[in-house]
Amino acid sequence: MTIRDKNKSAHKLRGFGPIYCINLDGQPERWEYMKEQFDYWEIKNYERISAYDGRDDDLSGIVKGLYPTNITPGEIGCTTSHLKAMKHYLDTSDAPYAIMMEDDCDLDVVRFWNFNWIDVYAYFPYDWDVIQLAIICTGDIHVKLHKRFVNDFSTACYVISRHHAEKLVRLHCRGGYTGKQTYKLDQGVKPRPVADDLVYNSGNTFSIPLLMYKIELGSSIHPEHIGVWHNGSHKALWQYWQQMGSGINIADHMNYDPYLGRVTEATAPPPEPETYPEEGKV
């Protein structure tokens, strides 16, 4: 991102926060990218969370209980970093929700919004736990608010309610202050204790792709996924917001269908209609 003129759309993200941005110590260029975005969008309410790097470090010292065997070291680092961010949020803020963000989140698409963050928050479902704001989907992307599909991937950015963060910290964090705790990942998270499953599958999660991810930064954990899944979702969403953003009715966009994707198909043949003898005949 280069230095640009004053952002005339900065008001759209007024009230967007507190933000807890997860960043590896060994990737300062990503943190510079995020700080430039925050400055451009006039966002002040953010903090950097130093991430655990499971790719190069042995994280067995911070994992309590059985060490997960069905996820990669990088995925363990990602999951524990998100839990660390939640613990820090609860320890240092009394805000009713927090925005968890990874260091490849892209805010540029906000310029296509014809609404603002306060409008979006006003339409959150009454019983929400998590709202996923950035999506990488292996199928068709549903652009309106919806109950999260299992193939709506990415923890690049999501909003988490305080009570759900408290639940996850209670289940998975052990010890005292932020940075000193250990983590339990053997609590039966299905299908695996990766960040997506641990955060989203443990509560009432909705998804709406209001933000994006910086495709040029690649992926620290799954670089092989960029060309397979990330590129397609990114291109489709960018075109959608560029072409359709100015005409969106946010009230309609946030009015989710509670039955979407939640009705089982009938695979058994329908029953034969019952027949009755004509009146007067046996």
What is the meaning of each model-derived region?
Residues 1-101, 105-282:
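An acidic/histidine-cluster motif and surrounding catalytic segment
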